[in-house]
Amino acid sequence: MKKLAIFDLDGTLFDTTRVNFLAYEKVLSPRGFHPEFDFFRRECFGHDYGYFGPLLAPGASPAELRAIHQEKKDCYGEFLDRAVKNEHLFALLHLMRREYHTALVTAGSRANSSQILQQFGESDCFDLTLSAEDVTRAKPDPQGFQMAMAHFGVTPEETIIFEDSPTGIAAAQAAGAGLFVVKGFN
């Protein structure tokens, strides 16, 4: 029976910090919000939008925060040329496909995840993709990882998770699976 390898997207398979920042900057600037890149990288990247949205647009109403997030997702593709692919991890992923089911579990949207995988020619490398739309509880909750394990009928002991962010690492640890921390890529 095949085991399971689960991969995070942002910061693990791709450095998308600049992509996400530029998309948010595009939709925030006309509204009078001007976040700095270092602030975004330090305080926002790797966290759920529900947490960092109010940091980017202080005082914005919940409806305005939802609109900002949707507009960001809509223009995300304009900045994909700023993403950096983790070539070494993709090489490992392709080798692992012989012995492992592969799953992508990301806090990002399905549309944005699909866009970046297509941009870099990696659309077919996952047996399962779970995105923000598929879960009701974001990382650090392990729900997405648990759903992937249930989908393939594997145990945490038969699973390894590749993650980079503190919230993703906490989710992987809560899931009880093996953990490979990707450091220094983004």
Q: Could you say what each language-model-derived stretch is?
A:
Residues 15, 104-106, 181:
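Hydrophobic residues in well-ordered beta-strands that form the structural core
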Residues 77-104, 110, 142:
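Short, acidic loop-to-helix structural element flanking the phosphoryl-transfer center
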Residues 1-3, 91, 100, 110-186:
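Asp-based, Mg2+/Mn2+-dependent phosphohydrolase catalytic module
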Residues 45-75:
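A metal-dependent, Asp-based hydrolase signature
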Residues 33-41, 59-68, 124-125:
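Short, surface-exposed acidic
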Residues 21, 25, 37, 45, ...:
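An amphipathic alpha-helix signature
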Residues 19, 44-47, 71, 84-88, ...:
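Short beta->alpha linker loops
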Residues 1-42, 174-175, 185:
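Active-site neighborhood of HAD-like aspartate-dependent phosphohydrolases
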